[in-house]
Design a protein with these regions (language model features):
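Intrinsically disordered, low-complexity regions
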Residues: 1, 14, 46, 62, ...
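Pre-NBD coupling/linker segments of ABC/ABC-like ATPases
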Residues: 1-6, 244
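ABC family nucleotide-binding domain
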Residues: 7-223, 227-232
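C-terminal boundary and immediately downstream tail of ABC-type ATPase nucleotide-binding domains
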Residues: 222, 233-277
Length: 278
């Protein structure tokens, strides 16, 4: 697997990333860093390239220009699918639509990757799967099938499944956007707990208050560009770009709080602690 000898501390590094589909330029020179143990949120309007960035990190999309590094691996130089599979053992990906196998039980959905990908024997794989289900408060649904679960429960199982290969990094792609509002909180609680345990996470999300609460760094994207990035406090309380401020005014304008203006601080107070339902 292609690698680089780098003293950089960042777990993920993107430099000058360009990606086009035909004449449609989707990414236009993306630079992004994720330090080990950080939670990084990518926010911005729909169609701004957020989810595309995540797919580039895992090698699901091939860029035309720029470099992608995960640990010591140069993702943009991986030519064989076997090399990309090795990378994906280290990078968990939780999708918007769960992507659970509908014909397998919850437990079997978690056992299959450790057995097929890591070669772990069934007894140990099942033991690990049950421990991960307990971690997301879904152990009581081990024998259920995805169709018998709520959207929030399915997404919690999907998060547990992403942990089965013991990844260094988990990518979350708008994992609450398809959920009923009443089940969003249970998924956010699990993500919050992972960040508190030191799991490196990159989130594409429209949950602005949650992003501000958990993120070490926030990137605001539009039209395939990083418009602004900085700490959560800086982006949400003191955005320097008027476009970032306008986006946040729109996203948070119905909350009753004073709308942000570039360079003018505001506070997101009383952020709720989401409860976890079963």
């Amino acid at each position: 697997m292609p690698s680089i000898d780098s003293g950089a501390q960042s777990l993920v590094s993107l430099r000058d990333l360009h990606l086009s589909f035909g004449n449609n330029c989707v990414l236009k020179g993306i630079d992004l860093d994720v330090e080990r143990g950080q939670a990084v949120s990518i926010i911005g309007p729909s169609g701004s390239g957020k989810s595309t960035i995540l797919r580039c990190i895992t090698g699901l999309l091939q860029t035309q220009r720029g470099s992608i590094r995960v640990g010591q691996t140069r993702v943009d130089e991986l030519m064989r699918e076997a090399e990309r599979i090795e990378l994906r053992k280290r990078v968990g990906f939780v999708f918007q639509q769960y992507n659970l196998f509908p014909h397998l039980s919850v437990l079997e959905n978690l056992v299959i990757a450790p057995r097929k990908v890591l070669g772990i024997e069934r007894g140990e794989a099942e033991k690990q799967a049950r421990a991960l289900l307990a971690k997301v408060r879904m152990e009581h649904k081990a024998d259920a099938y995805p169709g018998q679960l709520s959207g929030g429960q399915q997404q919690r199982v999907a998060i547990a499944r992403a942990l089965t290969t013991r990844p260094e990094l988990i990518l979350f792609d708008e994992v609450t956007s398809a959920l009923d509002p009443e089940t969003v909180g249970e998924v956010l609680t699990v993500i919050r707990e992972l960040t508190e345990e030191g799991m490196t996470c990159v989130l594409v999300t429209h949950e602005m208050r949650f992003a501000e609460e958990i993120s070490d760094q926030v990137y605001f994207t539009e039209n395939g560009l990083i418009v602004e990035h900085g700490s959560a406090e800086q982006i949400f309380q003191r955005p320097t770009s008027e476009r970032t401020a306008a986006f946040l005014r729109h996203a948070l304008g119905d909350s009753g709080r004073r709308n942000p203006t570039a360079g003018d601080p505001f506070l997101l107070s009383n952020i709720s602690r989401y409860s976890l339902s079963v």
